[in-house]
Amino acid sequence: MQKKKSLNLLLALMMVFALVLPSIPALAATSSMSVEFYNSNKSAQTNSITPIIKITNTSDSDLNLNDVKVRYYYTSDGTQGQTFWCDHAGALLGNSYVDNTSKVTANFVKETASPTSTYDTYVEFGFASGRATLKKGQFITIQGRITKSDWSNYTQTNDYSFDASSSTPVVNPKVTGYIGGAKVLGTAPGPDVPSSIINPTSATFDKNVTKQADVKTTMTLNGNTFKTITDANGTALNASTDYSVSGNDVTISKAYLAKQSVGTTTLNFNFSAGNPQKLVITVVDTPVEAVTATIGKVQVNAGETVAVPVNLTKVPAAGLATIELPLTFDSASLEVVSITAGDIVLNPSVNFSSTVSGSTIKLLFLDDTLGSQLITKDGVFATITFKAKAITGTTAKVTSVKLAGTPVVGDAQLQEKPCAVNPGTVTINPIDNRMQISVGTATVKAGEIAAVPVTLTSVPSTGIATAEAQVSFDATLLEVASVTAGDIVLNPTVNFSYTVNGNVIKLLFLDDTLGSQLISKDGVFVTINFKAKAVTSTVTTPVTVSGTPVFADGTLAEVQSKTAAGSVTINIGDPILEPTISPVTATFDKKAPADVATTMTLNGYTFNGITGLTTSDYSISGNVVKISQAYLAKQPVGDLTLTFNFSNGNKTATAKLVVSIKDAPKTVTATVGTATVNAGETVAVPVTLSNVSGISTAELQLSFDATLLEVVSITAGDIVLNPSVNFSSVVNGSTIKLLFLDDTLGSQLISKDGVFATINFKAKSVTSTVTTPVKVSGTPVFADGTLAELSYETVAGSVTINAIGPVKTVTATVGTATVKSGETVAVPVTLSNVPGIATAELQLSFDATLLEVASITVGDIVLNPSVNFSSVVNGSTIKLLFLDDTLGSQLISKDGVLATINFKAKTVTSTVTTPVAVSGTPVFADGTLAELQSKTVAGSVTIEPSQPVKTVTATVGTATVKSGETVAVPVTLSNVPGIATAELQVGFDATLLEVASITVGDIVLNPSVNFSSVVNGSTIKLLFLDDTLGSQLISKDGVLATINFKAKTVTSKVTTPVAVSGTPVFADGTLAELNMKTVAGSVTIEPSQPVKTVTATVGTATVKSGETVAVPVTLSNVPGIATAELQVGFDATLLEVASITVGDIVLNPSVNFSSVVNGSTIKLLFLDDTLGSQLISKDGVLATINFKAKTVTSKVTTPVAVSGTPVFADGTLAELKYETVAGSVTIEPSQPVKTVTATVGTATGKVGETVAVPVTLSNVPGIATAEVQVGFDATLLEVASITAGDIVLNPSVNFSSVVNGSTIKILFLDDTLGSQLISKDGVFATINFKIKAVPSTGTTPVAISGTPVFADGTLAEVQYKTVAGSVTIAAADIKAVKATVGTATGKAGDTVAVPVTLSNVSGIATVELQLSFDATLLEVASITAGDIVLNPSVNFSSVVNGSTIKILFLDDTLGSQLISKDGVFATVNFKVKSTATNSAVTPVTVSGTPVFADGTLAELKSESAAGRLTILPTVIIVDSTVAPTAVTFDKANQADAAITMTLNGNTFSAIKNGTATLVKGTDYTVSENVVTISKAYLAKQTGTVTLEFVFDKGNSAKVVVAVKEIQIVNSTITPVVATFEKTAAKQADVVVTMSLNGNTFSAIKNGTTTLVKGTDYTISGSTVTISKAYLATLADGSATLEFVFNQGASAKLRLTIVPAVVDPVVTDFAVKIDKVSAAAGSTVKVPVSLINVSKVGNVCVAEYKISFDSSVLTYVGTTAGTSIKNPAVNFSSQLNGNTITLLFFDNTIGNELITADGQFATIEFKVNAAATSGTTAEVKVATISSFADASLTEITKVATVNGSVKVS
């Protein structure tokens, strides 16, 4: 009772709150903020109203100022425009002050409805985005001024909100505040009208037609009424076309937005009261994504055909209606065989076509329906099948298939789409003449030996000097017995070897003589003798060449090769039982030694011993073999494999025992010794190893102080055997790496303690005694004879260096100089405080943008400079090098100039001083090569400008033109100083102007070479470059270029600027940049003629239902129309388009006109295909639409009108204005409508019988389609069948029915839609019901349910009525249930099924049935319930007892799971006992009295019939066989595999591959006894596949398929070796030609570094050019570049990097021998010259000797040079060994002197044919015998420059 009273009280309180709450003001809102206010200017008359407003957040939650509005009410005192000036707005946010001045907004609202004497205007203050948010207690203060546009006075005393007294912010109730549009404080002067709001207030619209979408916003009206939307100009939007309103939701039409310009569109929402609200829409126009056509890249052999696909991607979802794709190909290399449409092309026979003309292919697509067969997805557009023509040479030819001309792609509206085309290639491979390495085939029995030859064919004439090939085989089937060299291998014991590793054999051949024992003919290379292992059936196993074979010819040039696989077929043969041992693994621990035992199972073999062991190493007891611990203790740690040998007649066998030998390893100690040495002397530091137990490999890294010590040499210690092979060392900076590897991996181990290596250090200079460590750094590596890693420890050493005297500090000083631009100046580099310098390396840096090195001359403190001094200039760096070649006699021994650098100054516009300084760390060493200390002094060069720089003026001209015409706009240059290069960008408005052409001006010389221009959108780029860099400068003022613009259509006169944009670049003849200024131009465009407004009028018509009427669409006020798109809408429920005919104003309509009908819309399209000569030029009918009227019951007029936005354009494709006039069609009914009656008949029958119930139709008007649904009680009736009645014509096509539970759906559709109507009354269908068992009789309804549908011949709906029927069920005669035991046949061991069936079933709830059988012959395997038993796991059970079976059924539900139909009650599965081998018939009978009861558990009558089981005699099963049992499937030459079965009385069942079963009809087919395995299935397999043929009895048969993969031919390169010389004059790109062999080039790698394409190398076709700039960065010596391809092995280019040779700068009189190159076997001439003759005046006598390398060069002869006058008298030469004496003597002693530099002699050599490429043979001056001048005074100072011959 108390609870009920509480509930009543709560309910009463809720009712009170419901009545009271609406009248309570929103306290939370009013308390959310306070607004305080005062006027700072209180003058009665003033030109400025100055409100001060303070807004404070008084609530606990944040106050978003974007939601806040404050209104000030006043009289505007005039109609002038007004402005609010926000002087300051600051928010105090905690301790931070935030300026919001720019965020304050003000909106002036004029009161027009009810102004008062104190108010006709209010200003509403708000905040823009980015404003502050106020937390509790925070405030913002606004200070500002309101003024009129003419600054006239306001009268404030009559203003509603004016406060004349306050001087600080106070609450002013006449100032109102709003949050979220709701007023929260203050009182307004008139009605309190809050502003409406919209959300969102901003949006984005994309003009891209694929992305256009309406823009929506929602209004919160706040009691106001929405009025209009206006744009920024005040123009109202059209409420029916520009936007729509649904409730408070406003949708701005995408059609309206699509007309707006890119940028910002502001729409004002206007309401009945309050402020207008702004919706700001950002309009963008993203580019339409280009449809991409990609032509495939394929390979083909010459003479064969290949398919090249053309794929389309980025197909728009709306689809493509038309495509025209012109392609070009190399018709000299390719021939078009066929072109087929791809799978994305629907109805290709109509929509697709192609043409081939010469080397051009045109692919054409046009959706003939213009809508229903568009290309709508990515995929193959077309496939071009080419036949490759023959090519010459061995290099593959790459030919392109690419775009020719402009592709045309159009969408469903025939709007052009951008299209990009990616070119394809066809690589034609030449006929393959490469050498082939082939593996043979063999057949062998298991256990026997098969010899498999490996042959070489097409051996090159240059022979094979080296070969490395790898052969793979299946080690589970084959074992290598031996490998023998073939007869083409000479001296095989020396030249041939092989290794076997698992399933791989490596074959190695090397002609040890490198020439005299080459493989020079085709034949057997090797024979591999395989021993076949046991198999259970015949199997063929592949033997293949794997990896990439390597062959080189007699010149060691790489020989390309191809491979062919072989196989071994192994037959079962005699059963093989090979001997075995157990166990096959064991462990021996040296710390706990014990014998190792294993037991042999000989299987008829004899044990013959253990390989490598004597009988003392093991013992035998019976079949047990023990390996003695004494033998095992001697073995090294690791796995020891012992081979047990057996024999059986001529058969041999082995078994292997692997013993793991274990022992704790020793710890090796590596000790570095100590030593003491004087600075400049050498000392030996030993590295010793102790506790050595047998070391096979060692890697030891030592570190030392390279500023104190220098490694002179490293020698191996005496514990290292064969050190020239096993020991090596590497010095890198301050690190030494010592490496040891026993090359024999066992016989040359380090086996004792001692010195491992001795390091000989030279001590550098020190100023005081110092001890420096030498120690092991990093992680040492030691391994024993098994390559197991050893532990280690290290002991550090040291070297103590004693100082030998004070060290001087050398000072290197760079001088200073001043020079004018373009002139040369000398800058000396001097050395002071010189102690005696043997070597110096000095690097100078300078600004290469200001200075250029002209030359470098050696200073006078350098002796023998041609030998001892050199210099190198690299960019902005100079390296000066000095080395006393005598290491003592030519030291720099005094202070002075080391070198003078002659700089040429570059152009500057003002004086600049640039430093020249020593960079990096100089290196100086004294005569002992001890390093010297140094310091440097920097220098500089001051550059003064040579002349002032002019300022070039580029002026764009002006012009006037009419729309559609062309006008010339010149671009002139003035104040030209001489211009070598110019780049000028001109911008214009591409919506108004189009570039027709650009012509070069007369001031440009050789314009075809020096001038170019590029037009890109609205930008023109003008480019000039004097190709001669001097002789064709622009040297005078004048026109640079003339731009010819075509003016586009305008409706009013407009002037558009044409101006230089960006930053022009001009440079003079020295490429120094020039100053620039520009003058803009313009083009004024005048309209050519007024634009007409086209009127499109749809006509009207009247028609009767079912008839056709013509509705014309006419055009009037036609100005000349090139394109028109018109959409006509109609009501498709009333009208149907019969046809559309083109009007007479359309010329060439089959090309220019089309139409598309889509639902209730007709699209009429016109496009003058000539774009000019077939315009619509007169008023008249554009098209006539022929409508067929549908059936109506009363007269109706339906509109036919232009919908959407029509598009018209004139002959210039300028859009035309238009207006439309709607039409209509009036439809009158043709005749009255009949009402069809559908009647379901009645029938009577007994349970179990079938009765026919007819469904008849009457009052039939002519029915084309009918759908009738009939309902019945499915618990009482079951549909047996449904047949069509006699009023249904062609029922197999027109009639169908569906039964679903208790519902029948009967369907009729006249497939002809007219000639097979139901036209008379009669039976529509007959339903044959079978009556189910029921407990009592009764009548059940059969009636039409749902809503029938009937339609006449016009498909107009026909009215109907229905009459229900029924089935009366009478009691059935009760028959006895009969239980029948079935019969079966089987043999001993078989399991056979004996069914027990029930018939005359009327609904059984329980069954008990007992069967008897002969238990001496039969055994019950299982008993399963039959399909008439529902829920058998619950309702069914059985019991077997001896020879009796009891079967029980009880419907656990006692009603819903009765046995209700005849069928199998149970199946007894008998197993025939193995003793029943003879023929017999044994009965299986029903014994006792069966018990059956119905659903009421009333007992049913029953009867039974016995069964029997016939036992057949045992039959011997013969296994089925197949032939062949082994096949090879070649993926390169695919074919089905046919297998013949010998069934032997069995039946073929299936084929299995492992656990997978092949699919018949897909993976294979069967024809009688032949099974054909599909090549499509075989192509998916890899390796060896075993297919198991399964039969109904007997064993399965197996077919082994060896799948041969498509051979990948490795790509190759030519050449494979190359030389790059770093000498600047000799640097050249390295060009490599690739033979791709069907592969694709991927990259080039140098180790782990990938070269950069386009920078480090370039590709043109199959040619790769490696940049000399990249090659110059490689380290001197050798380098290997790896060419990587998408498949197959990479190819390697081995490079020899020759260091730069810096010829010394020779300033003295000298003999100079040139350096030349020549090929092996060729002759070469070496010039010998005299230079700097002026230094000695003249030469009268010259005698000197030249030596040469006779191992490379053979002397041919010498001829006098051009410097020799009268050579027959004055010149002679003589050869003595490898020395040539040259003699000159002016016999006149004065008249035939040598007075100038020139060629003294030419020596001719022949390069030995055997000389190796890259070898350099020295040709040098051996002795200077005598030189004298005209006074016969001896010339004592003669320098020499030696030469050489390099073998190329």
From Swiss-Prot:
A cellular-component GO term for this protein: extracellular region
Pfam families in the cross-refs: CBM_3 (PF00942), CBM_X2 (PF03442), Cohesin (PF00963)
Every CBM3 domain range: 29-190
Residues forming coiled coils: none
UniProt PTM comment: The N-terminus is blocked.
GO molecular function: cellulose binding
InterPro entries, A to Z: Carbo-bd_X2 (IPR005102), CBM2/CBM3_carb-bd_dom_sf (IPR008965), CBM3 (IPR001956), CBM3_sf (IPR036966), Cohesin_dom (IPR002102), Ig-like_fold (IPR013783), Ig_E-set (IPR014756)
PROSITE patterns noted in UniProt: CBM3
Signal sequence interval, chain numbering: 1-28
Main location per the UniProt record: secreted
Gene3D superfamilies listed in its UniProt record: 2.60.40.680, Endoglucanase-like, Immunoglobulins
Keywords: Carbohydrate metabolism, Cell wall biogenesis/degradation, Cellulose degradation, Glycoprotein, Polysaccharide degradation, Repeat, Secreted, Signal
Cohesin domain span: 291-428, 435-570, 668-801, 810-943, 952-1085, 1094-1227, 1236-1369, 1377-1511, 1709-1847
GO biological process: cell wall organization; cellulose catabolic process
Subcellular location: Secreted
Entry function: Binds to cellulose fibers and coordinates cellulase enzymes.
Listed name of the protein: Cellulose-binding protein A
